[in-house]
Amino acid sequence: MTRKPLIAGNWKMNLNHFEAIALVQKIAFSLPDKYFDRVDVTVIPPFTDLRSVQTLVDGDKLRLTYGAQDVSQHDSGAYTGEISGAFLAKLGCTFAVVGHSERRTYHGETDELVAAKATAALKHGLTPIVCIGEQLEVREAGNHVEFNVNSLRGSLAGLSAEQIAQTVIAYEPVWAIGTGRVASAADAQEVCKAIRDELGNLASADVAAGVRVLYGGSVNAKNVGEIVGQGDVDGALVGGASLDGEQFATLSAIAAGGPLP
C-alpha cells in the first residue's frame, strides 16, 4: 500500500497569532500547490494561533492543514486549562498531537492518558498523532525497540482496529529532540518497522500497511530526504525547522520527491 508522506510542523510554544499568519503565508508562497498532490503538509501551532490560521487557510483556500499540540481526554466541564476535541473540531483542526515527549516529561503524561486523549480526538473527528520515543539511557542499553513497542501498546490501549487505522504514529527519540543529534536513517527505520509490525499485531496487517509512521527529532532540509526515504518512515514531525517558512517548504518538497520549489 502506498502511503502519502506527511510533514507536520510542531511550532511548540512559539509565535503569536500575527506571527502565525506571516509564517503560514510564507509556507504557502514557498510551496506551490502541485506538491500537495504528493505530500500532506500540516502545521501545529499554539492554541492561541488556531483561529487566525483557520481564517487564513479557509479564506485563501490553502491545501495546507493544521492541528493542535494537545487535546483533553474530557469533552467539557470543570477542567480549567483544558481544551476539548469538540472545540478543536470547530476550529477546523485536522490533527491533534498526543503524548509528545515534552508533555510526558514536563506534565507526567502516561501511556494510559495518551490513549484516553487519542480516543477523545477520534471521537471528535480529529486524527491523533500519537508520539512515542525513548530516552538516551534506553537507547544506550539497547532496549529501544522493546521500549517503543511497549509504549505503543499502552498508548493505543482500548482502541479498536478501526480506530488505530485512523491514527498517525510519531517516533521521536527524546535524545534527538532539539539537541541537533539525529537518529540515523537506519535507526529510524529500525524502530518505525517495529512499530508497524506491532500495529499488525494490535489491529491487522492491512491496518498496519495503511498507518503513517513519522520520525521526529532534529529533522531539517538536509536530512529529511534520507529519513523519509526509508521503507517504513512516512514523513516527519518537524520542530525548529518548521519555524522557518522556506526551510519547511523545502523539506516538504523533498518529502514529496522534489524538485525543490
UniProtKB/Swiss-Prot annotation:
The active site is at residues 100, 172. The keyword Isomerase applies. It is an enzyme of class 5 (isomerase). Its EC number is 5.3.1.1. It catalyses: D-glyceraldehyde 3-phosphate = dihydroxyacetone phosphate. Substrate binds at residues 10-12, 178, 218, 239-240. Pathway: Carbohydrate biosynthesis; gluconeogenesis; Carbohydrate degradation; glycolysis; D-glyceraldehyde 3-phosphate from glycerone phosphate: step 1/1. Gene3D superfamilies: Aldolase class I (3.20.20.70). Homodimer. Involved in the gluconeogenesis. Catalyzes stereospecifically the conversion of dihydroxyacetone phosphate (DHAP) to D-glyceraldehyde-3-phosphate (G3P). NCBIfam families: tim (TIGR00419). This is Triosephosphate isomerase.
